[in-house]
Amino acid sequence: MTNLRKTHPLMKIVNSSFIDLPAPSNISSWWNFGSLLGVCLIIQILTGLFLAMHYTSDTMTAFSSVTHICRDVNYGWLIRYLHANGASMFFICLFLHVGRGLYYGSYMYLETWNIGVLLLFAVMATAFMGYVLPWGQMSFWGATVITNLLSALPYIGSDLVEWIWGGFSVDKATLTRFFAFHFILPFIIAALAGVHLLFLHETGSNNPSGLCSDADKIPFHPYYTIKDILGVLLLILALTSLVLFSPDLLGDPDNYTLANPLNTPPHIKPEWYFLFAYAILRSIPNKLGGVLALVLSILVLAVVPFLHTSKQRSMMFRPFSQCLFWILVADLLTLTWIGGQPVEHPFIIIGQLASILYFLLILVIMPITSLFENNLLKW
C-alpha cells in the first residue's frame, strides 16, 4: 500500500515541503532562520489575536485599554510583552536571514529574493503601524513624522498625507485604519511567505559553498526538522528571557506617556529595528531626497542580483568580499547607533558618511572587488 502522506492531496503538499524535500547535506545553522521567521510570524499572529480581543482602537481609550490588558487581563502583560519583543526577535531573524542571503549569494534565485524584499517591506509596514497602536507619545509623534514624509512627493504629497490621516492630523481615523491594516497585513505576509517557499522549492536551497548540490541531497526529515526544532527552542529561550527579565529593554520610555499633540518629545525616534533607515533619512538635508534614500536603503536589495560580477556564487572562498561584507555589517550597526542619537555634531557627519558608505559598498565597491577577485584567480 502506498504511503498516505504521498497520496493524500493535502498531506502530499506538506510531505513535499517539509518531509521528503531533498535538501543539501551541508547547509549550516544560517539556514535555520527561515523556519524561525515562520515561528515568529505564528507567535505574532496568536499573541496579536488575543491582544485584539481586549484592545480598542479609539484615541480616547487606546492607551487605557493597553494598561487594562497589562493589569486586569489574565497573563495580559505576558501576551503584550511577547508581542512587543516578538517583533524585535522577528527583525533580528529577518536581518540575519537577509545577511545570510547576501553572504552566500542566495539572491541569485531571483523570484525568491524579490518576494523576500517585498516581505521585508510588508513586515516593516506592519511593525510601524503596530507601534502606533498603544497611543503613547512616541506612537503619536512617530506616526506624525513618518506619514508626514509623504508630503514631500510632488503634486500629490499633501493630499496623500491627509488621505492617509483621514483628516488634518493623526487622529481617531488614523488609529482605526492603522489597527485594521495591522490586523490584516500578517495574513498577507503569511501568504507571501507561502509563495516565497513555493519559488524556493522550484530551485532547491542554496548551500554555503554556492555549488550545485544535486549529487548530494538528504531528506529534510529527520535531519533538518530536528535542527530547526533546536533553533526554535533557542529562539523561545531568548524571547522568554527578554520578556520575563527585561521586557522594556528595547522599548522607549516616552511610550508610557499618553499621546499629547501639544507636547513634542525631545527626541522622536522609531523602534531600534528602523534606526538604520531613519539615520539614512536624516542624513540628507532635503526632505524629498531623504524619503527617496529611506526607500532606496531597502529597495537597493532588489538590485543586488544584477550587480553580482563574481564567477563564484558564495563569498565562502572570496576573502576580499568577506571583508567588505563585514564592513557593511559594521556600517549598518553604526547607522543604527546614529539613528538613536540627537541631530547634532558629531553625529550628523558620522551619519552622512555611514549612509554614503552603505550605498557605495553595495552599488560600487563590492561589484568592483568581485571583478578584481576574478582576475586574481585568472578567470
UniProtKB/Swiss-Prot annotation:
An additional note in the Swiss-Prot or TrEMBL entry is: Heme 1 (or BL or b562) is low-potential and absorbs at about 562 nm, and heme 2 (or BH or b566) is high-potential and absorbs at about 566 nm.
Species this protein is from:
Sorex unguiculatus
**MF term (GO), any:** ubiquinol-cytochrome-c reductase activity
Q: Which positions in this protein are listed as binding heme b b566?
A: H97, H196
Q: What's the family? A: Belongs to the cytochrome b family.
**What does the entry list as the binding residues for heme b b562?**
H83, H182
GO BP, sorted A to Z: mitochondrial electron transport, ubiquinol to cytochrome c
Pfam family name, one: Cytochrom_B_C
Could you tell me which InterPro entries the record lists for this protein?
Answer: Cyt_b/b6_C, Cyt_b/b6_C_sf, Cyt_b/b6_N, Cytb/b6-like_sf, Cytochrome_b, Cytochrome_b_C_euk/bac, Cytochrome_b_N_euk/bac, Di-haem_cyt_TM
**Subunit structure, briefly?**
The cytochrome bc1 complex contains 11 subunits: 3 respiratory subunits (MT-CYB, CYC1 and UQCRFS1), 2 core proteins (UQCRC1 and UQCRC2) and 6 low-molecular weight proteins (UQCRH/QCR6, UQCRB/QCR7, UQCRQ/QCR8, UQCR10/QCR9, UQCR11/QCR10 and a cleavage product of UQCRFS1). This cytochrome bc1 complex then forms a dimer.
Binding residues annotated for a ubiquinone, in chain numbering: H201
Its GO CC terms? Answer: mitochondrial inner membrane; respiratory chain complex III
Membrane protein topology class: Multi-pass membrane protein
Encoding gene (name): MT-CYB
Compartments (UniProt record): Mitochondrion inner membrane
Q: What cofactor(s) does the depicted protein rely on?
A: heme b
Cofactor comment in the record? Binds 2 heme b groups non-covalently.
Name of the featured protein: Cytochrome b
What does the record give as the function of this protein?
Component of the ubiquinol-cytochrome c reductase complex (complex III or cytochrome b-c1 complex) that is part of the mitochondrial respiratory chain. The b-c1 complex mediates electron transfer from ubiquinol to cytochrome c. Contributes to the generation of a proton gradient across the mitochondrial membrane that is then used for ATP synthesis.
Transmembrane annotation, as ranges:
33-53, 77-98, 113-133, 178-198, 226-246, 288-308, 320-340, 347-367
Which key words are in the record? Electron transport, Heme, Iron, Membrane, Metal-binding, Mitochondrion, Mitochondrion inner membrane, Respiratory chain, Transmembrane, Transmembrane helix, Transport, Ubiquinone
The superkingdom listed in its UniProt entry is: Eukaryota
